[in-house]
C-alpha cells in the first residue's frame, strides 16, 4: 500500500493538473500517505486492504469509505476536493461518473438500432492503425476523401462526452457507427452520419485506447463485439449492437498497470499490450519500494476472454535487491512498458511491439527495453529483440538535487518507443518495420533478419526526449511524423532520407506548437492534431498546408451535453466513408482539457 499511495500522489497531479486542491498539493497527499501506510500494506494489520484490493474498488466506494465510513475520522482534516481526487484515482475515474455518462440522459437517441450484418459492407477504421500493419493509412476507397476534397471539409456534427476531461480513446468507425471513449470510462456507440447515440457503456475506469471490433462466437445473440482496456488493467468485450458486457478479464494485477495501446484482434485471438505509471511515481520518493512492474503482451481468447499466453518484456521476475538507509526494500528488474498497439504479421506468425525504458539498474543490462521486439503470435515466444538505446534506466523526478535511493546512479534519457512499429514492403521486395522513438530518431528494422537495422534518421538537430511520442503514418513511399518541437517530417521508406519538413507555429498564444498526436494519412494528404487544439492537413507531396480547423472554438453539440475542445496529444484523427473524426482534449504535460468529438465531411 505504501508504494501504491505514492503512485496515487503522482497520478493525481497528472490527471487533475488544474484542480483547486493543488493549493495544498503534495503536502496534504504525503500526509495522507503517512497516516494510512501504517495500516494499509502492513501485514500485521490484517483488516486493512492492500493496494491491489483497493484498486478493485469503485471510486464511489472509496469516497464513501473516507467520508462516512470507518476511516473518515482519520481524514477529517482532508478537504472534500482532495477526497474526490483520491477516490477518482483509486477508482480510475471521477466519482459518480457512471451517473453522468448514461446515454439515456442525452437528447438525441437514435430512432432505431439495427443489427450489424457485416463489417465489410461499409468503410471502416478499426482499432489504432486501421489495419494490422499499423500504417495509419486509409485507402482511397475506404476514405471516401481525396486530397482535393480536404480544403472543403466542414464540421458536420459535434458530440459531447459527459464527465470527461481527456479524449483518450481514438474514434473507431465500423458498420456506420462511431465507437469512442474517454477518461470518464464512458463508451459510446454513435451514428456516423448524424451523431445520434445508440448506447453507452460504463467501464470500471478510464479508457485510453482505440476500440477494436470483430465477430464473436458462442455468446448467444451477440454477433459482433467491441474490445478495449481500461487504466486498471481490465480488458472488455461488449456487444457492438446493444452495449451489454460479454466478458471482462484482468490481464495484470500490478496497481500501476494500465492498458494504453489498443488491443488488436486476429482470428479468434485478442492481443493486449500492458503499460504502467510506476516510473512516474518512484523517482521522487524515499519510501517507495521500487520497482516491480514489467511490461507484457497477453493473448486472450477473443470469444471468452480466457488468457492463452502472456509474455513479459523482461523475462526475470523482480527480486529483492537491497534496502535503503531507512529500511525500504528495493526490487528489480522492472520496466519495459508497452505503450503501443501491436503490429501483426500473420503470414510469419509474428507480432511486433515497441518497448519502453527500464526502471531499475541490474548487474547485467536489460537487453529488451527501448527497442523493437518480435513475438510468436501462436505461442508467445520471443522471436527476436533489437535494442536501439541500451542502458536507459529512467524514473520521473530523478536527476538534479534528487537524492532518492530509488534513482539510478546513471539516469537514462527516457527514450521509449511509444508508437507502434509500421510494417511496410519496399519495391525491392524487402520488408521493414518503421518505428519512431522519443528522441526524434526513426528506425527501420528488418523483420526477416532478426530486427537488423536497415537505416536510421535523426529528425531534429538537438536530441531531447518526447520528440516522437505516439507515432506516424506511412504510404507506399514515405513515412510521416509529427514532432513535439513543432513540425511535420516526411521520410523516404527506401533509405530514410528526409523528403520534406514543414514547420508549424502555434495558432494560440500561450499554447505550444507540438505535434505529439499520431499522424493519419489518406492518398495525397496527412492529418495532424496539435497541442494548440488545431487540426491540420498537409500535402504528402511537399508538405504544404491544405486545411486547418480550431477545435477549441465554441460549437453546439448534437446530444445536448456541454463540451469544449482542447489539446490533441495522443490519439490521431480517423477517416472512413467520406468523413473525418477527431477527439479534442488532452491534459498530459501542458495540454488543455476537452470532451469533444468532432465529425467533418465535404458539404
Stretches with model-predicted labels:
Residues 74-102:
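C-terminal capping alpha-helices of c-type cytochrome domains
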Residues 26-33, 37-74:
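Gly/Gly-Pro-rich "capping" loops immediately C-terminal to redox-active cysteine motifs
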Residues 46-48, 132-139, 163-169, 188, ...:
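Short, solvent-exposed loop/turn elements at domain surfaces
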Residues 18-32, 103-107, 111-112:
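Electrostatic cytochrome c docking/interface patches
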Residues 5-18:
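Bacterial N-terminal signal peptides
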Residues 104-155, 313, 317-318:
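Blade/loop signatures of beta-propeller domains
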Residues 147-162, 187-207, 213-222, 228-257, ...:
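Extracytoplasmic/lumenal domain signature
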Residues 1-3:
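N-terminal secretory signal peptides that target proteins for export/translocation
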